[in-house]
Amino acid sequence: MNRIVFVFACLNLFLFTLPLSAQNEEAKPPKRFFGFRSLKDTATNEKKGTFILPLIYYTPDIRWAGGVAGIYYFKLPAKKASEKETRVSNIQFLTDYTQNKQLDVWGQWNIFTRNEDYLLKGEFRYRDFPDRFYGIGNNSNLNQVEKYEYSLLSFKSLFLKQVKPSLFLGFDYHLEKQFGFKYTPQASLESGQIPGSRGGVQSAVGLVSLYDNRDNVINAYKGNLFELSSYFYLPAIGSTYRFTYINSLYQKYWQIKPKHIIALQARGRYGFGEVPFLDLSTLGNDDLLRGYPKNRFRDINFIGSQLEYRFPLFWRLGMVAFVGAGDVYRNTSDLSFQNIKYSLGTGIRFAVNPAERLNLRLDYGLGKEGGFFYFIVGESF
């Protein structure tokens, strides 16, 4: 298998900006460079806009695939003197289709209502894709991998009310159906002994508390984020399995000098009950612990953290360096310094909209078993 996925994006990027206030029809259009407004223009004029990125990529499992990713971002202005302008809200989407006739459609939203009285977050996904199962535990063998395919339909809807400055409390609902499994013959998943290997429905209610005083939710320069949530998957509301997850997330940002940022993230996920294998905590993705195959390790619990240094280069280009460590585990006795997974790497940033700090990122992460490239809209955290 090719360890580093070859990914490239069409360079004909499209940026459409839609000013909130009407402009003089006779005003001269802003000067552009390769389709992008000058830093001065984007720093003062753009309050909302849409960025669309065509994608083409190849992996051995799906062969060639093409699609489009994008983000729509906006702010709601204050209508009264007592109100404040909201931070940036955003709606993201991605869809791609493969040479093997597989489809992935994903959407996510993070919306502040006027005066930030409420925060609405959610996610929708339909996925019909191949995946890889390396076993359960933090010491699984990379070479003992099973290929499988499945379909997934998922919906999450989070409603939060601001009860004190920067403090939000609310509820979440998660509904997901996993079906249409196809396995490698004589694989461990095919036996049906692993919970969730025959599919099912996961239905949960969640209790969520969030403290967020970051200056920008897309790409913070300063501030803190702390989130604590509990999700209860119950047969009484349609869940095939009964289990619970408690999630913790902390992020801190320091601006040590203009546009030089140190960012810290710590994350934990702790499960109880009979957890289907697709809902287990995982290690290996495009944000925390970059440098491992997707979902390389799975188990009930996860704990990990990362540190990232972000700094400008010139024009719209910036650079980052990052390091992280973490692991999955069933019991605390499974954790050890010898088994802990580390990640380090670097990346390039291209500012699509400097005013709202919206970046394209190209990262290379290196882990214990090799490295991977990642090309994505937005920061890792």
Name these PLM-found stretches.
Residues 73-77, 96-100, 127-131, 176-180, ...:
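Sequence/structural signature of outer-membrane beta-barrel proteins
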Residues 68-69, 73-90, 128-132, 208-237, ...:
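Surface-exposed extracellular loop regions of Gram-negative outer-membrane beta-barrel proteins
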Residues 8-17:
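Bacterial N-terminal signal peptides
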Residues 24-25, 36-48, 76-88, 114-119, ...:
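Short loop/turn motifs that connect adjacent beta-strands in outer-membrane beta-barrel proteins
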Residues 50-52, 89-93, 118-122, 167-171, ...:
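Transmembrane beta-strands of outer-membrane beta-barrel proteins
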Residues 42-50, 57-201, 283, 296-298, ...:
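Gram-negative/organellar outer-membrane beta-barrel architecture
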Residues 210, 216-313, 322:
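C-terminal outer-membrane beta-barrel translocator/porin domains of Gram-negative envelope proteins
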Residues 54-56, 68-72, 107-111, 157-161, ...:
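Residues on the lipid-exposed face of transmembrane beta-strands in outer-membrane beta-barrel proteins
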